[in-house]
Every structure is written in C-alpha cells, then in structure tokens.
Amino acid sequence: MINFSFSKKISFLILIFITFLIPLNLKGMHHERELDKMKIFELYEDWDIAVEASDIDGYVNSLDENVILIPPDGPTITGRDSYRNFLGPVFEVATYKLEQKTPRDIKFYGDFVTVEYNIVVYINFLGNEKSVPSEGALQDSVSDSIYFDLLKRQEDGSWKCLIHTWRQIN
C-alpha cells in the first residue's frame, strides 16, 4: 500500500521547490538580460569611439566574422576582411563625428538581438576631397539616418554585429 501522507509530503515539497525555483530563475534571466544590455552598450560605445577616431581595427573588432553590410546605395559587403577593405578609403578621406538622436532600441531573440537607433553623422572631408570613394559609404556632410543592426552572441558571451544597414532620412 502507498503511504498517502508520504506522497502528500513529497508533493508539497516539490510544490514549494517549484514555487521558489521559478522566481529565482526569472531573477537570473533578468540579471543575465541586464548584463547582456551592458555588453551591447559597451560594444556600441567602443564602435562609436572607433568611428570618431578613424580606427579601422577598433571598428572591425565590433563585427562578427561573417558580417554583412547592406548600404542603401551600394553593393552588399560580406565578411570582416571585405568590410575592412571598404573602411580603408572611408577613413582616409574624412573624419566623422556622431550625434545620437535616439536611444538604441534593443530587442532580444535568443542569441540574436536587433538594435535600431537614429544617429546624425557629421563628415569632415580632408584636404580637397569632396566624396568618399567606397561605393555605398555616406557622402553628405551631414547624414541623419535610422540604423538597424542584427547582433549575434559570440561563443565567449560577447556580442558582435552580424548585419549593419541604415536608411538616410535627410
């Protein structure tokens, strides 16, 4: 015969365990999400610094190995090395100043994140340059754009940009 009082005790203990485990797990998930947001904000801070410093290595460090750049007025560029080649002329002929107009809107989808934001890029052409020779690069001295990025969580837990694109609104 089954001892029902024992079964009730076990059921009660399981219920208590689940009652306390679920909130702890949700707190852990919330903490992990906040940690991920901090890592993402740090990624963008480093990326913005690299742009304003014309630092190709710093910029490329923000990119996934299989990054895809989709400029609105140019060919799609695939891979970190191709992106690096694209950036060479971009930083050789101009310097850049960024003004963030909206906070970065971050949405999580497991190991992927979408980020949408509005930034004004001020381009200061160097010497007698009047344009950037990289096809698809920003050309206007003031460029107000909505950016959309897809980030991918890396094996080490960091985040890198997998897809980068924008829509110019000025």
What are these regions (language model features)?
Residues 1-7:
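N-terminal secretory signal peptides that target proteins for export/translocation
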Residues 11-22:
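Bacterial N-terminal signal peptides
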Residues 24-26:
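Cleavable N-terminal signal peptides
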Residues 28-43, 49-58, 68-170:
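A beta-strand edge to alpha-helix "cap/lid" segment located at domain peripheries
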